[in-house]
């Protein structure tokens, strides 16, 4: 009886142990609930403190950065800035977030968990304005890997300062930078690095209205030294080549046509003063308006731009065409002035000859006659006085033709000289700005 009781007891204990082992095996096979796992990983019971950086009092945290450009545009010359929409991705290792209790290799967490972990204090050094995106939810991504690697991605729109050199405008190439810098951590605590696999990526089909974004990536390091210490800084440079299509249609071609229109006056008769003066004044005023319009969308800089030189030379040619007619008209009328001068000289000589005769006005007798004793009237006559004779009509006509011929010769020379000089200016202008200066910019 006693042996039977012992046998039953051993049987019960055996089955109890087997059941407990099976329960333990089932418990080990089923993963920990996510909420419990997260509380254990970064909750209050975990001892994780988001205020303390990884490797505290140890080596600096290396943060690898890369950006994906969604859109690039709104490049403003007046304010010298540009607008860009990007995905900013930062990746670093936090040993405190390494785990082995959960089977997944990585965890994609809700953006609200970002407040529970440590993050780099990255900011954009040349930022003038920025905003996050919250439609339809916060555009943020947080991913934690088993080895403690943290990926933090965020979508932001930035307005960044871009100092521009407009000397070659509108044939310029601008370099706009994006600087990523640590605000509070010195290089003893935090270091930014560009991702070697793809630091800067651009969306397919990205186009700009006035610029071409060069494909080559210019990535640099720009460590900053302040009174508070040495801070890590990385920068990306975007090389933007301006497209001339808009400016050719809106500025260069209209001003070129205005200059050519001013040359029409060289083929108009010099006697048609209203037509030539009206054409000259109209082209000058139009060119002035065109020149003012070219500067309306540009900042007030102290140096001369390429478009300023073009507009100034075009205005000079148009104004010179107006002055050319003034010179032609002046020379054509010189024969009348010369005849008027000769007429005044003859009158002056006649007056001088009259002053040499005797004047009997004091005796009550006229200067023309003298009463003799015998009653005969003696007419005053001075045989030595020069007699005035008008120049022959042929001489006047020849003089008129001479001056008109000179005036016409100026018009004839202007018909060739103005286009030729303007052509030479164009050759030098386009060679200088499209070839020579363009090569200098690419070398830099």
From Swiss-Prot:
Residue ranges of the TM segments: 247-268, 274-294, 306-326, 413-433
Pfam families: Neur_chan_LBD, Neur_chan_memb
Extracellular face of the membrane: 25-246, 295-305, 434-444
Activity regulation statement: Activated by glycine and taurine. Inhibited by strychnine. Allosterically activated by ivermectin. Inhibited by picrotoxinin. Strychnine binding locks the channel in a closed conformation and prevents channel opening in response to extracellular glycine. Can also be activated by GABA and inhibited by bicuculline, but this requires heterologous expression in human cells.
Tissues where the protein occurs: Expressed in brain.
Binding site for Zn(2+): 216, 218, 239
Glycosylation sites: 62
Binding-site residues for glycine 2, renumbered to this chain: 228
Gene Ontology biological-process annotations: cellular response to amino acid stimulus; cellular response to ethanol; cellular response to zinc ion; central nervous system development; chloride transmembrane transport; monoatomic ion transport; regulation of neuron differentiation; response to amino acid
Family affiliation: Belongs to the ligand-gated ion channel (TC 1.A.9) family. Glycine receptor (TC 1.A.9.3) subfamily. GLRA1 sub-subfamily.
Subunit structure: Homopentamer (in vitro). Heteropentamer composed of glra1 and glrb. Both homopentamers and heteropentamers form functional ion channels. Interacts with glrb.
Name this protein carries in UniProt: Glycine receptor subunit alphaZ1
Gene for this chain: glra1
